[in-house]
């Protein structure tokens, strides 16, 4: 016993002696000390850690960078020498999970294998192989749960590796969250699933409106954080046991974060406000609206009466339909379809509002190609004040008498147009209103004939005396108030939100969130070809007959995994504009966020502040530049040989041939948009800051301030149009520094273009045309979903929306509105 005590005492004294030597460590003896006590370090981790701490302290106190680097390399070497054990998995290890320390088991995922190792020795306890790469895993009690490609979930015994159950949940899954015996999984898109961890049975599933990129569990509630195409965040709160939606926040709330504590929900918005809500009470309030709309759906009914059951087509005839709103609520008729086996008429009308318990007569011009008694179905589509849509069908019999002596070909559209134009050619000051009344429904259907009529009216204004011109001018204004400019030339439905569009000749190129790329005939809306990229299309530009795409991960902040590796790369593609044939593709080491072209140079703005330049002919990289900030680059513009881009609070100017930095300018807010006018750069920033800079030097010439972040901007002469995120559009005179006008929209401005003296806006679910000089609304068009981008070619306005809708509108109807504005001024 005495001998053992002496041994322990000597051991303690030995350690203290070593510590004393280490305390004298310096730049000349640190290697010598390591060699002297290497064997002691391998057995005593405490004393080894003490040595490493002293090395780090020494390195921090050195002014010599080369010597510090030498010590740093030395530390890496000795740390490698101190490895306790090593295991070769045969591939990239992307996930580790440790069972309770007492069980001494570590689980690791590698490609399509799962290994269980002894944490002390590194010896393999068991191995399990699945069909595809394992994406995630976790351990609960005595089971290990893993998810592998294809949406498969598997549960194993953690001690033996034996399979307990396996189930296919969705198409693809990501991550796990666990509460009691309920596992919550996401599919990487909009679906969330709840699984019983004991049996593998699906308890429920929930579909969010937007892509879910983060979920957390608090007590018995699940919080989902979603993000739309603009990066705006939405939150759902679900009941973990049933999947029932308790709360939803987004849109008008502009929520930036959400927490739940007991019965209180805490919201923070992007304007710096924090709200505390009673969770249960607010949940009840949010449920009231669906209940009300269900009640409305039950009671909104209409009656339809055919007022004329026989049509004689010796003259242009109309079919009068009487519709009665039987409910107490107002409704809006949006479409009437009259169909039989011959599909005799498919008719769109301008919206007609019918108040509760009211009746209206609607006259429809009808042009059948058959005669006799026809059984027809009349389908009326309408919506109530809650925007709930309805469709009702009525069956009638209609008798048709044809033109005497005419054959079916006499009713060809081209003959109808010819007859109508002959009538319009006889337009004069006494019959112009009568002609409009007779052919109003035809005008609603036939844009070419309506434009022909409008041009004749304009000629009448120009050739009349002032008093008569004013009368005709008033009539024109009335027509434009009645006539919907939102009747479409065509509509196309893409797969995924249409983020970008570009026009070359008669071809419209669409780039989608889903990675789909379409070429559309601008005149007909017919699809010419389709291409599928690897990821979301963030950049799109056309040079000659080459379409160049920049693609990357749809998420801004989520790390994507592939085969256990962090997926950060993007892609650039070059396609033949006429065929869609892939000319080349280039794998980029960073996710692409923007794209522009100058001559044969393709410039890509990427995540983490990188700018890359590629050769347009082969896709080879020419140069690379790294901005000071690591944020994504979403704004690129090129003038002559100067490349301009915004990254965080800085605007950079580079030589486009070499990538050399020419100058940089620091703004007071994050750069959101930019535009070039002659030798000046206009900059729109977060916080409403607007700057005018000299393009050659970066010198600040003017500074303006508006409300809200400037998301879009465009310049016409000396007028700058600013589209902001607080549902406002501003016009500035850059010479006078004055605010000319402001216009309130129904959402953030995502598309902005100028055509002659009209400003075109894409905001939320609307397209607007505004007078650039006054800000007065010329027309407004409602879309099925939020407008993401717009462009105009000749007189055709193309808009792409978040749910894949693409609309083509004829701008020709208001090409003469400047004359109309003059009439208004006279009035």
Curated annotation (Swiss-Prot):
Cross-referenced SMART domains: PQQ
Keywords: Plasmid
Alphabetical list of Pfam families matching this protein: PQQ_2
InterPro entries for this protein: PQQ_b-propeller_rpt, PQQ_rpt_dom, Quinoprotein_ADH-like_sf, WD40/YVTN_repeat-like_dom_sf
SUPFAM superfamilies (alphabetical): Quinoprotein alcohol dehydrogenase-like
Annotated Gene3D superfamilies: 2.40.128.630, YVTN repeat-like/Quinoprotein amine dehydrogenase
Name used for this protein in its record: Uncharacterized protein MJECL23
């Amino acid at each position: 016993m005495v001998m053992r005590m002496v041994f322990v005492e000597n051991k303690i004294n030995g350690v203290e002696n070593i510590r004393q030597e280490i305390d004298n460590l310096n730049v000349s003896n640190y290697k010598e000390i390591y060699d002297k006590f290497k064997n002691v370090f391998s057995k005593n981790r405490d004393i080894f850690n003490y040595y490493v701490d002293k090395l780090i302290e020494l390195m921090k106190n050195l002014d010599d960078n080369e010597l510090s680097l030498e010590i740093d390399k030395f530390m890496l070497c000795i740390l490698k020498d101190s490895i306790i054990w090593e295991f070769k998995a045969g591939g990239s290890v992307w996930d580790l999970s440790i069972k309770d320390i007492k069980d001494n088991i570590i689980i690791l995922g590698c490609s399509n294998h799962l290994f269980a190792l002894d944490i002390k020795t590194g010896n393999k306890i068991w191995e399990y192989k699945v069909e595809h790469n394992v994406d995630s895993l976790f351990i609960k009690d005595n089971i290990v749960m893993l998810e592998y490609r294809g949406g498969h979930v598997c549960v194993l015994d953690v001690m033996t590796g034996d399979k307990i159950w396996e189930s296919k949940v969705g198409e693809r899954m990501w991550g796990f969250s666990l509460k009691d015996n309920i596992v919550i999984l996401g599919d990487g898109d909009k679906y969330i699933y709840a699984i019983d961890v004991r049996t593998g049975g699906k308890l429920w599933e929930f579909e969010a409106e937007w892509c879910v990129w983060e979920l957390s569990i608090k007590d018995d509630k699940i919080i989902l954080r979603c993000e739309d195409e603009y990066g705006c965040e939405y939150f759902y709160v679900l009941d973990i046991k049933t999947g029932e939606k308790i709360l939803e926040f987004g849109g008008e709330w502009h929520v930036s974060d959400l927490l739940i504590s007991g019965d209180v929900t805490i919201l923070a918005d992007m304007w710096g406000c924090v709200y505390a809500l009673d969770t249960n009470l607010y949940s009840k309030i949010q449920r009231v609206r669906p209940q009300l709309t269900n009640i409305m759906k039950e009671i909104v009914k209409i009656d339809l009466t055919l007022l004329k059951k026989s049509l004689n087509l010796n003259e242009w005839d109309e079919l009068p339909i009487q519709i009665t709103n039987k409910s107490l609520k107002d409704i809006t008729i949006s479409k009437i379809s009259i169909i039989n086996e011959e599909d005799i008429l498919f008719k769109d009308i301008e919206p007609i509002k019918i108040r509760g318990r009211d009746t209206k007569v609607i006259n429809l011009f009808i042009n059948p190609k058959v005669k006799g008694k026809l059984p027809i179905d009349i389908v009326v589509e309408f919506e109530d004040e809650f925007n709930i849509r309805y469709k009702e069908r009525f069956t009638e019999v209609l008798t048709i008498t044809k033109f005497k002596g005419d054959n079916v070909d006499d009713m060809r559209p081209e003959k109808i147009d010819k007859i109508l134009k002959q009538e319009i050619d006889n337009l004069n000051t006494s019959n112009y209103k009568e002609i409009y009344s007779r052919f109003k429904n035809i005008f609603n259907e036939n844009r070419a004939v309506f434009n022909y009529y409008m041009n004749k009216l304009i000629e009448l204004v120009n050739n009349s005396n002032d008093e008569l011109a004013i009368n005709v001018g008033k009539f024109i204004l009335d027509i434009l108030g009645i006539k919907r400019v939102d009747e479409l030339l065509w509509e196309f439905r893409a797969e995924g939100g249409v983020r970008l569009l570009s026009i070359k000749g008669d071809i419209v190129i669409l780039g989608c969130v889903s990675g789909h790329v379409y070429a559309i005939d601008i005149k007909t809306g017919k699809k010419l070809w389709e291409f599928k990229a690897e990821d979301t299309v963030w950049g799109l530009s056309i040079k000659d007959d080459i379409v160049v795409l920049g693609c990357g991960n749809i998420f801004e902040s989520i790390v994507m995994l592939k085969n256990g590796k962090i997926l950060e790369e993007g892609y650039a593609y070059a396609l033949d504009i006429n065929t869609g044939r892939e000319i080349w593709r280039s794998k980029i080491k960073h996710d692409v966020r923007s794209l522009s072209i100058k001559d044969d140079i393709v410039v890509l703005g990427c995540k983490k502040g990188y700018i890359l330049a590629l050769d347009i002919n082969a896709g080879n990289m020419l140069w690379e530049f790294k901005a000071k900030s690591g944020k994504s680059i979403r704004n690129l513009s090129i003038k002559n040989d100067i490349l301009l881009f915004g990254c965080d609070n800085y605007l950079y100017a580079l030589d486009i041939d070499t990538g050399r930095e020419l100058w940089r300018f620091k703004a007071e807010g994050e750069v959101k948009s930019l535009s070039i006018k002659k030798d000046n750069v206009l900059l729109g920033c977060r916080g409403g800051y607007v700057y005018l800079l000299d393009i050659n030097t970066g010198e600040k010439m003017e500074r303006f301030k508006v409300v809200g972040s400037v998301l879009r901007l465009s310049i016409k002469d000396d007028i700058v149009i600013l589209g902001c995120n607080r549902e406002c559009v501003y016009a500035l005179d850059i010479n006078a520094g004055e605010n000319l006008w402001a216009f309130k929209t129904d959402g953030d401005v995502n598309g902005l273009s100028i055509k002659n003296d009209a400003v075109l806006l894409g905001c939320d679910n609307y397209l607007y045309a505004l007078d650039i000089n006054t800000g007065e609304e010329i027309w407004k068009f409602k879309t099925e979903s939020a407008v993401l981008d717009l462009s105009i070619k000749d007189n055709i306005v193309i808009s792409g929306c978040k749910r894949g809708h693409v609309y083509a509108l004829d701008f020709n109807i208001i090409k003469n509105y400047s004359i109309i504005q003059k009439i208004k001024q006279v009035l």
